[in-house]
Every structure is written in structure tokens, then in C-alpha cells.
Amino acid sequence: MALWIFCPRVRIQGAELMAARGPLLIVANHPDSFLDAIILGAYYPRKLHFLARGDVFRKPIYGFLLRSIGMIPIHRAREGREHLHLNEGTFQESVEVLRRGDGLLIFIEGICLLTHEIQPFKKGATRILEAAHTAGIQPLVHVVGMGYSDFRAFGKVVNISIEVFSAKAVFDHARHRLDFNESVRVQMLRLVDVPAEGVSLRKGLFYLLNLPYFRLLSSFVWRRTAGTVFYDSVLFGALMFTYPIYLVAFAAALHGIFEVPMLITMLALPIGFRLTSIRVVTK
């Protein structure tokens, strides 16, 4: 339900490819931080493991939580070269994911800048594929382009385009890594499709009933994520974990005053907001 409200329209071109079985490497662009992984993980009908920036794993509690949802740390030079040697373990763990026949998602740009402009590719995807081929594993490769109607506003239209990698991945020479990245770039540039629509909020009853909670939460998240690219993903996570608490508290208050059954209130508040307050409109 969280994505149904936060992203009221998600279009998927090539959705039939999501049913692929066996080892799968998903190579995607990275326009909107952790929200990209959340959306792809929600719509692929299989467990996905994700490669995520290694610095967020350094606090033990964060590392435990991120690993519990299938994330694997990958370390970048900008986070400290002393951590780069840990990537050997990352690539080995990624190969084991593929060996089990699971899905692995990597954002090949290695950085998120809240833009649909494709950034220079890193070597992570080629390193994983090369190691997999050496181990006798030939994963299917999906190239994914993601486009958002907005990076900051509540409510998004999301376009996802998926294709099978159109060239043969061979890594007999260092030059082949560059060839792979260039082939993916050409394919990805064609797949990124920024929606022509946006989301408008209609100020009705259900909007007003949710407004105090959302204003308070979004202001708090905005302050905590100022100067970063994490506003969307942190807001979504905060909504997912705290909105049920708000629903219970609101339903309990309404039940105490008017004896309205709590279950009815807890269902009516989010569904009514989604159906009456959120509109997809042409920009």
C-alpha cells in the first residue's frame, strides 16, 4: 500500500521479462537514491539482492538492517581508499548470489545525483560478470531505465523500461569491460523515459485528515536530509514505518469519541486519501 500511495502510477515496459528464472544481473540507472531499489524490489516477483554504497553499513545497526533486506556493501574511493580491498568480498558474495540462481541489482553509475542524465559508468557490473563467467555462471542481464516525474514532491509517476542486454558479454581482455559498459550505455539511454505527467494533490477531507501528520514528518525528514540525495527514500521509509502508528492513534481517538470501529478508520484513511486526493495530471 505504501508504494500505491507514494507512487500512484508506475508504468513498466517489458514487464514480462521480470518473470525470468535463474541467475539474473539487473543493471539500472540511479536517479533517486534508495527509492530506485525499493521500487524495483517491489515489482520484480523474486527476491533481489542490491549493491549499495558501503559507507552506510559502517554503523552496526544500519549494516544489520540493510543486510537483512538483501543489500550488499560496495565501497567507493571517495568513501576512503582504505575500504576498497573489501570489494573483493563484495564481488565474491555477488557471485554466490548468482550461483544460487537469485537476482542481483547494481546501479552501474555508482552514484546518485537526482538527475536522469546518465553518469559515467563504474566497473562493478563488469567485475561481477567477469567473476561469474570465471566460475562457470552465465547470468541473464537486464538493462533497466528508470524515470521519475519529480525527485522531491510527494506522489510520483514512475516509468520503468526493461530489456535483455542486447550484446554478448565477453571478458577475455580488459578492453571488453569498456565495450560492455558502452553497449549498456547505448541501450540505457534509449530506455530512460521521463514521465510527461505529474501528481497533483486535491485538498479534500482525506487530505486534511492526513495533513498534520504528513507536514510534521516531511519537515523533519527535510531537515535531516538537507544537502543530500536521500529525501525521497528516507521519507518513504519513514512513512512506511510511522504511518501505521498514526492510523492506529487516529482510529483509537475516533473510536473513543464517536465509537467508530477502528478497522474501518484504518482502512478508510489511506484508501480515501489515495482515491480522492491524488491525481495524475499532465505537466
Question: What are these model-predicted stretches?
Answer:
Residues 4-166, 204, 218-230, 236-282:
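Soluble catalytic domains of membrane acyltransferases
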Residues 210-219:
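Membrane-water interface of transmembrane alpha-helices
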Residues 174-182, 186-197:
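Long, charge-rich alpha-helical interaction segments
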Residues 200-209:
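Transmembrane alpha-helical segments and their cytosolic interface motifs
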Residues 164-175:
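Acidic, His- and aromatic-enriched active-site or binding-groove loops in soluble protein domains
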